[in-house]
Structure formats: structure tokens, C-alpha cells
Amino acid sequence: MAAAAVVEFQRAQSLLSTDREASIDILHSIVKRDIQENDEEAVQVKEQSILELGSLLAKTGQAAELGGLLKYVRPFLNSISKAKAARLVRSLLDLFLDMEAATGQEVELCLECIEWAKSEKRTFLRQALEARLVSLYFDTKRYQEALHLGSQLLRELKKMDDKALLVEVQLLESKTYHALSNLPKARAALTSARTTANAIYCPPKLQATLDMQSGIIHAAEEKDWKTAYSYFYEAFEGYDSIDSPKAITSLKYMLLCKIMLNTPEDVQALVSGKLALRYAGRQTEALKCVAQASKNRSLADFEKALTDYRAELRDDPIISTHLAKLYDNLLEQNLIRVIEPFSRVQIEHISSLIKLSKADVERKLSQMILDKKFHGILDQGEGVLIIFDEPPVDKTYEAALETIQNMSKVVDSLYNKAKKLT
């Protein structure tokens, strides 16, 4: 019985590259077959077949079938050790949740698995599944639920010895706080995660996630793009080594850093590099267009890139936030360059030169006047911008302060001399 299953499993593996459907059918037949619990070889083959089938279903985008497999194998989990059962459930659930083809059943399936783990009194598995649920809540923007479950889980994990899972949950807490724009708490959670991670061996995926979040926090809070770039590069190498779909995201953030560092010419070199070449596509093309627009200081090209690659640029909150700031800086530079030769200029003329609507130009100019980027007023009645010369700086206060400081030094010197005489 076991020998036949081994032969079938080997045949399924040999068909992986040529005929995936046939391989899936063979693995299905092995998984559905009843086996004796005391037949160790048959149990091992069935376990390998379940993992291989799950991986194949994920690669072929069969999300519903993978969800069904996760429920179907539960009776079999009682015939293997708790550690193996936990690894099997986690692996299948990770495959299901990492798929691009969302079914809308992710949270429901995760909750079902948690309930099953509770009923079977599998504490470690339940905690691992709850960590995945926190991740799901974060992905679906249910931030308050993510924080509530995460804080409960952190209290439990700090009393136990599963440091890797503790790092995972601390990272999720940092991501959630960052999404809620609470940067001090996001940084504190990240620092806790890095401290915990220093004491253990981190698997490549966890280390890459840690580097990715470090890069995001450095970019968001400190605008330290050089440090952020090095973190994103480490994350990219980590994700690339395990063929994770998140590798492309870290590559996009690397390209974003180069644009924000005002070195858009490096973007082309990065994209055509050996490591990044396999990720060529719309995601990298989007950043290449933004880099070109930034290099040319062209608002029209920038807006075209944002329109043509809406999903790739606007749907990513990290990229969207920083590109909005880049666009703002680019607009200010363009406006200052346009108005520089004038002392009085029509707003319509400015809007025609930089190819933006009159209302947008008016709004931006009034903001720049309030921020003291230049001195002037908007005459909305006549639709003109009047620019004043830079007012001379009154140096009376500086001179007075300098005089007082010098007098203070003289008084101190006289006091010290008088002290020596007495």
C-alpha cells in the first residue's frame, strides 16, 4: 500500500513541470485514500502529498480548492504528531492567504481553523493562527480589531518561549500603528521586534519582513532615504531567496528611494540589474515613468504616470504618500521658476505654462504665500499674482543682542579682576 503511494507520489513530482493538472489529480487520489495510522511510510507520503498539492493549488490560483483541502485534512491531523499537524495547517493556511486570488472567505476560514485548534486544545497552533488573523485584519484595513487581538496575543506570547511568533506579532503591531499614522508607537513596536529578533535565529521570510518595516519607518518618520534603501535592499534579497511575491514590493520601494534621493538616473540601472531583471513588468515600469518625470521636472509626465499606472502607484499607501510629497515639491519648483521673471502676472498665464487648472494653481500659490516661499499677494478680482521683492532683513535686534553679549563679557571680565584684587 505504502510502496504504491510512494511510486504515485514520485510520478506526480515528475509531472510538475510538464502536466500540472495530471500531477494534481494523482496527488488528490493519494490525499483521499484511507491509510493505517501505524503505517509510518504511508502517513509520511500522505503528509508530503498534502503539502505538494497545496503548493500546486496555490500556484495555479485555485483558492476555493485549497480552502477545501484545509478543511478536508483535519481528520488526518489526529494521526500525526501535534508539531507536524501544526506545521501542516500553518503551511496550507499561509499558501491560501498569500494567494493573489482573494475569495473573500479568508477571515472566515482563519476563524474556523482557530476554533478547531481551540477544540483540539492545540495552544501553540491557535496562537500561530491568531497571528495570521491579525495579519488578515491588517490587510483588510480592520485596524482596531488587529490591535485588540494583537495586544491579547502579545500578553500571552511574552509568557511563553515562541520568540519568532512574538517578533511576527510585534511587527504586525508596528505596521498597524503606522497605517493609523501613529509613528511613535509604530517605531516603539518595531524596536521591540528588533530587540526580540536579536536573541533568536530569524527565518528568511521573517527577517525580510523586519527589514521591510524598518525601511518603511525610516522613510516615513525620518525621511532617511539612504538607510531606508539599504533596509529595502536586504528585504528584497530575503524575499527573492524564498521566491516570495513581496520581493517586487521591496524592489518598488528601492526605486522610490532613488527617486526621493533625487537620483532618478539610478532607477534604470537598478531595474536592468541581474537580480531585478526577472521582476520586470508594470510595477517597475510605473516607477521608471515617475523617475523620468522627476528627472525632466515635468508635471505633465508625472500626472500621466499616475493616471497610466493608477493601480501600481496610487493603490500602494506607502508609494502614494511619498509620491504626493514629491509631486508637491515638483509643483513648487515649477511655479517658482515660472513666476521668477515677473512682478505682476496673470494666474491664467501661469496655469497655461505649467498645464494645470487655474483653481489648482491659485490654491497652491496661496499656500506658498502663507508658507513664505515667496512674498506676494493674489488679486482675485483681476486674476493676477503680484510679486514683491524680498523685504530687507531688519538687523537691529541682532546688533542689540551682540552688544548685550559683549557688555556681558566685559562685566564678567571686570568682576573677575575685582575678585582677584580683593
Swiss-Prot record:
GO molecular function, one term: structural molecule activity
Tissue-specificity statement: Highly expressed in embryonic stem cells (ESCs). Expression decreases as ESCs differentiate.
Modification type Phosphoserine: residues: 14, 23
Highest taxon listed in the record's lineage: Eukaryota
Predominant subcellular localization, coarse grouping: nucleus
Phenotype upon changing residue 14 to A: Does not affect phosphorylation by AMPK
Keyword line: Acetylation, Cytoplasm, Isopeptide bond, Nucleus, Phosphoprotein, Proteasome, Ubl conjugation
Outcome of swapping residue 79 to A: Does not affect phosphorylation by AMPK
Entry's localization field: Nucleus; Cytoplasm, Cytosol
Maturation and modification: Phosphorylated by AMPK.
Domain PCI: from-to ranges: 224-392
GO terms under cellular component: cytosol; extracellular region; ficolin-1-rich granule lumen; membrane; nucleoplasm; nucleus; proteasome accessory complex; proteasome complex
UniProt KW Isomerase keyword: no
UniProt-listed Pfam families: PCI (PF01399), RPN6_C_helix (PF18503), RPN6_N (PF18055)
SMART domains per the UniProt record, alphabetical: PAM, PINT
Numbered residues of crosslink Glycyl lysine isopeptide (Lys-Gly) (interchain with G-Cter in SUMO2): 274
Residues with N-acetylalanine modification: 2
Biological-process GO terms, alphabetical: proteasome assembly; proteasome-mediated ubiquitin-dependent protein catabolic process; stem cell differentiation; ubiquitin-dependent protein catabolic process
Function: Component of the 26S proteasome, a multiprotein complex involved in the ATP-dependent degradation of ubiquitinated proteins. This complex plays a key role in the maintenance of protein homeostasis by removing misfolded or damaged proteins, which could impair cellular functions, and by removing proteins whose functions are no longer required. Therefore, the proteasome participates in numerous cellular processes, including cell cycle progression, apoptosis, or DNA damage repair. In the complex, PSMD11 is required for proteasome assembly.
PANTHER family according to UniProt: 26S PROTEASOME NON-ATPASE REGULATORY SUBUNIT 11/COP9 SIGNALOSOME COMPLEX SUBUNIT 2
Quaternary context: Component of the 19S proteasome regulatory particle complex. The 26S proteasome consists of a 20S core particle (CP) and two 19S regulatory subunits (RP). The regulatory particle is made of a lid composed of 9 subunits including PSMD11, a base containing 6 ATPases and few additional components.
Family statement drawn from the similarity comment of this UniProt entry: Belongs to the proteasome subunit S9 family.
Name assigned to this protein: 26S proteasome non-ATPase regulatory subunit 11
Designated gene of the protein: PSMD11
